[in-house]
């Protein structure tokens, strides 16, 4: 997956996320880096750290045409056995043609709040939120 995507977008999106979570009264654990991870690692992280909401910033596959395209995968209380139906994603985050990183950061904060309010993510969130 594309490391260029993280390098290209993290400086813009990270401060928006941190400020947004602070303003919303949401606590944030220590961010960390996982080399060569895939989206399924969210289940392992969920089992170990038991967060209410987990957000994974990950570069899209370089073969998709834009090496700087990043996605934010999100899950409410992820755990072993969860699959894509239990997750939400904000994709195609990059400046100059994709979702602007600043706008994506604000949206991710709002979405995390929605997950906590409804205690759900993925298909369950869509059903709970109507």
What are these regions (language model features)?
Residues 1-48, 65, 73, 87:
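Conserved mixed alpha/beta catalytic, RNA-binding, or beta-rich assembly cores of soluble enzyme
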């Amino acid at each position: 997956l594309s490391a260029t995507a993280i390098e290209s977008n993290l400086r813009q999106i990270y401060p928006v996320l941190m400020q947004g979570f602070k303003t919303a009264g949401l606590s944030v654990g220590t961010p960390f880096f996982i080399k060569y991870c895939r989206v399924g690692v969210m289940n392992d992280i969920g089992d170990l750290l038991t967060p209410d909401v987990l957000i994974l910033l990950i570069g899209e596959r370089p073969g998709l045409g834009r090496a700087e395209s990043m996605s934010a995968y999100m899950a409410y209380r992820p755990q072993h056995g969860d699959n894509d139906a239990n997750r939400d994603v904000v994709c195609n985050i990059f400046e100059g043609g994709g979702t602007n990183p600043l706008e994506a950061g604000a949206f991710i904060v709002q979405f995390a709040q929605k997950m906590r309010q409804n205690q759900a993510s993925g298909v369950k969130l869509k059903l709970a939120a109507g």
